[in-house]
Amino acid sequence: MRLSRYCGHERLPGGTRLWQRLARRAGFRGTVAVYGYGVGGRPGGAQRKAERTGVQYGMVLADYEPGLIRVWVPCTCQAADFDVDQLHDAHEDPLASFAHELGHHVQYGKRRTYFNEAVAERYGRLLLREFGVR
């Protein structure tokens, strides 16, 4: 797994080693692009506001396409009002979203399609439970 950070100040919840172990377990060898809130090219005013505030309203904090996972995390260089506990309780924190996207990667490897959200969610939760995170 190759890690690409936007500004270098973004911190991965649980640490980089945990993220690498999760990716290795799922067989992901692509790039993880890490963006701080308010950074990155997602269009739309509502999405930009969500990145600034950390409130996603049903949107995840990560995105998958074959060979690339984008993750949005709170960054010290961004002015983000970020409630980590609220996202953690809803399983919408960046680590849970990353595990969910790894579920899409596993789907893509088996079926060459990655659109089944229920399977990805289940795989992500099982992966986190296996590593003792949840």
Residue ranges and their predicted role:
Residues 2-13, 61, 90, 129-134:
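Long, well-structured alpha-helical subdomains associated
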Residues 12-31:
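Zn2+-dependent metallopeptidase catalytic core
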Residues 32-44:
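A short acidic/basic microdomain associated with nuclease active sites
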Residues 43-92, 105:
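Active-site scaffold of zinc-dependent metalloenzymes
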Residues 91-96, 118:
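Alpha-helical scaffolds flanking conserved acidic
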Residues 96-109:
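Active-site recognition of the HExxH zinc-binding catalytic motif
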Residues 113-134:
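Post-HExxH zinc-binding segment in Zn-dependent metallohydrolases
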